[in-house]
Amino acid sequence: MKDKYILTAESVTAGHPDKLCDTIADNVLDACLKEDPNARVACEVLATAGKILVAGELRTTASPDVEAIVRQTVRNAGYDCNYHVEVRLHTQSPDIAGAVDGDTLGAGDQGIMYGYACWETVELLPAPVVLANRITSLLTTCREEKLISGIGPDGKAQVSVQYAFGVPERVDTIVISCQHDADKDPDELREELCRLVIARACHDVRIDEQTKILINPSGRFVLGGFEADTGLTGRKLMVDTYGGLVPHGGGALSGKDGTKVDRSGAYMARYVAKNIVAAGLADVCTVSLAYAIGQAEPVAVEIDTQESGYYDDAFLTEAVRRVFDFTPTGMIRALDLDKPFFAEVCNNCHFMHPQAAWEQTDKTEKLRMTCAELEDERT
């Protein structure tokens, strides 16, 4: 390990065009699940100046008013909704339905998912991820609660943290791009963001005189949202997960029901990793899962603790396979993935919402007991 190094992560606000598309897709999913807990949903959203397109596949008894959902979601994000909304949702392929449905649910597709946890923060996430997402969450709060006047819904943040011997030591650089009114004084905006956002977000990692704080480094940021940038679901994968600091299998999360292992597998992998670290079985843990379409059990479950584990990785892998059910049915049941709450967790990282089932550390004692039983079996 290098003595000193810098790790960086970014986040975006709920009003960012890509994130707003994710929120629309998850609101469509939630609307289906409210009426039909067994709904099969794969919803994608493309939005640009003047037009929002909702497309994908459904198999459900629900009849959501998709256009109304789109318009309300855009308004809730802080924009006017003067858009033509086009809906192109069709029935799920019978081939996929046949592969997934059965006595035991099969995976909705093949794929690789990763989950991660580490000791660095209370959230058991890397410090740059936590700080970047706190900033974007506070940007939205400051706008909605009118703590800062003259700012818009669109925004981004990026945080670089300097580490010393594996420990977060100080904040090296903070970048914030915040949409604002044309007459907003830039010096006033900087002072408000430093006082009401940065100071509150970064209270537990040191900011010093050498910390670089860049506010709207491109200059003006008046035009935002879909009028400035085209938005698309699934284009903020690193923001949704671990900020690019952990491997990613490439599958997006939003707009997908629990049979889609891109989503359920990513949540379960995080759940397992967090419980391993919370149980004191490792300082750092990456969980990788792999699935084949139509098959219930994963084709691979692997644990990597970067040699920080109390037990070796093969031992921990065997333990988690005894404790956790990695089938789609098991993951949906354990993580409440047939409940309509997905729009609540799709902003500011899917793993920074303490109310989510996959963020609970309720398997720590079971993991410790299972490891002890495995030890006894081997002696």
Predicted regions and their residues:
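N-terminal, positively charged regions that mediate nucleic acid binding
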Residues: 1-40, 47, 367-374
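Glycine-rich anion/phosphate-binding loop at the beta-strand->alpha-helix junction
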Residues: 184-277
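Internal helix-turn-beta structural module
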Residues: 48, 284, 291-379
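A short glycine-rich, hydrophobically flanked beta-strand micro-motif that places a catalytic Asp/Glu
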Residues: 41-43, 155-161, 211-215, 281-292
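Alpha-helical support elements that line or immediately flank enzyme active sites
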Residues: 10, 14-33, 121-137, 257-280
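Glycine-rich, mobile lid/loop segments that gate access to catalytic sites or pores
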Residues: 8, 50, 68, 72-75, ...
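Short, charge-patterned binding micro-sites
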Residues: 42-60, 293-297
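Conserved phosphate/anionic-ligand binding catalytic regions in large, soluble enzymes, centered on
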Residues: 12, 16-21, 105-121, 222-246, ...
